[in-house]
Amino acid sequence: GHNLSTVDYIHRPDIRNAPKRDAAAVVTDGVYRRTGKLNITSVSTESGIVCNIGFDESLMYEAWKNVSLKELPGLPVIKYPEGVAALARHLEEVMRYQTPADYHVFRIQVASETLEETEYPEFINPIGSDGKTYALLKEARTERVVISGQAVDVRVPAGYGISPFLKVSRILEMIFSAYGFTLVENPFATDYQLSKMVVLNNVADTIVTGEIDCRNLMPDCTVNEFLDALFCRTGAKVYVNAGRKAVIRLLKDSIGATAS
């Protein structure tokens, strides 16, 4: 009777208010104490109360389930008061590995049209020659493109077509920081190969206003979808604890680790 009263007699068909789906719960046993979320699956006087309690990772995944990466709170906007030209020069230095940054810059082809045996490719981070080195095409210019089956000249502003690609390590840092977690172990920041991993985008007007809004660089998916994709591709698994500390471990490292 007492247990049923603590869950507002939700087994009764005549209750006025619908019971809460989840409730905070504290599990204690001697000095052991953990806080989680209790979910009641069924209640009856015959079988009692059937429930489950989620801890740590399950609570984290539940909180992030429907959160879009583009809508993460606190996403930075990188502003260059000097304008588009200065921002483009900075990204050019990043492309040449002269300046460390939270992103990489390199050319990718995002589209191509062929008209009368002439190809008209479209690039993010288009490159031209600057004397003996490669340089980003960063000035205002006229480009020839295919529109409705015809080749036409289009005038584009300075910085058009230039867009950095966010490092996966930085995206992970922004995810955990947004929800108050400290990321204490991140192989995407320390492993030589994984530290080069980025998320591509095809946003041609990223820097034309003289700033970089990181929302435009984020993939169009939820946090959970992003983390699941990382696990499928790299075996990276997230572990969190009640102290709001997070660790990312690779499956291969977990399998090969010596038990402590």
Model feature map: region roles:
Residues G1-R233, V240-G243, V247, D253-A257:
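Polar, S/T/G-rich
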